[in-house]
Amino acid sequence: MERVIQGNDAREQANGERWDGGSGGTTSGFKLPDESPSWTEWRIHNDETDSNKDNPLGFKESWGFGKVVFKRYLRYDRTETSLHRVLGSWTGDSVNYAASRFLGVNQIGCTYSIRFRGVSVTISGGSRTLQHICEMAIRSKQELLQLAPVEVESNVSRGRPEGAEAFKEESE
């Protein structure tokens, strides 16, 4: 029988674990490790004059179960391969497994949060709605990452709306 971990004990255990299984041979069910950029990478890719600008190398996400919060940074370069990799980094089953270690018999709050390029999405509810939170989190993560703007110069970005040439030819 596993004991319910509360307060400081829970935080200490969470700090000792990473989403990839962490120290001491524990397994949390999450497949990818934290991929936070080094201080040098962070300085190169951030505008120091704008402290609100996110690092363009990836995104931050977290799962919270009561007072225990698992955070990580994943690299994401907006390619199809990268999208499939980060979307497959956890499933509802792996979240349920990780949560079951901290939820115990009492209903506590569960929260998923993701921040990418200045947009932050947070989904929360009670532990009895965890499966629904997982489904919403997967959908939100996929939509947020797929809707990332592609930096391509177009007629619109140069001040000329698309079809301007066609309109000019027809009027002549």
Curated annotation (Swiss-Prot):
Record's GO cellular component terms: virion component
Pfam families registered for this protein in UniProt: Tombus_P19
Entry superkingdom: Viruses
Matching Gene3D superfamilies: RNA silencing suppressor P19
Region (Disordered): 1-37
GO molecular function list: RNA binding
Residue ranges with Basic and acidic residues bias: 1-20
GO biological process: symbiont-mediated suppression of host innate immune response
Keyword annotations from UniProtKB, A to Z: Host-virus interaction, Inhibition of host innate immune response by virus, RNA-binding, Suppressor of RNA silencing, Viral immunoevasion
InterPro entries named among the record's database cross-references: Tombusvirus_p19 (IPR004905), VP19_sf (IPR036131)
Subunit annotation: Homodimer.
Similarity comment text for this entry: Belongs to the tombusvirus protein p19 family.
Protein role: Viral suppressor of RNA silencing which binds specifically to silencing RNAs (siRNAs). Acts as a molecular caliper to specifically select siRNAs based on the length of the duplex region of the RNA.
Name under which the protein is recorded: RNA silencing suppressor p19
Organism: Artichoke mottled crinkle virus
